[in-house]
Amino acid sequence: MIESPNRHQHSIAGAYGPFQLMPDVARKFGLHVSAHRDDRTNISLAAEACAKLLKQIAIPNSIKILESHGYRITQEIQEALWFKLFVLHVYHAGAFNVSQAMETACPEEPGMNLIFKLWQTRAGKFQNASQNYSQLAIAAWYELDRHITYIP
């Protein structure tokens, strides 16, 4: 999900570009980051790096976090909306911060109730922006669907 659509902004943590990629993450996925050139501002290259980050880091870490809480993550679960929202939380806040939030929230079962608990949980660096991230994704999906299915 594009986090900084209007202009290229640096986060306090050092993330940059439309997908707010950290320098080390960008480099890991093949982007050039230096004082003279920063591929994080190239929407195509940054989108590809973001997709790799989701596939290679966010999804596997999401599965590890959930399995560490006793949840069995099947292919069917990975296709569920709540799991995709959980992955977005890991993408945005990082696996460590989501793990801390899970320890604090102590959700009893996987599903949308787990996501609702995360929306109300603060732990470590999992704060307001992290809580709201999947809500923004839902709003974006809703708007996209509304425009795709629009009939004048």
What are these regions (language model features)?
Residues 1-152:
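Catalytic glycan-binding domains that act on GlcNAc-containing polysaccharides
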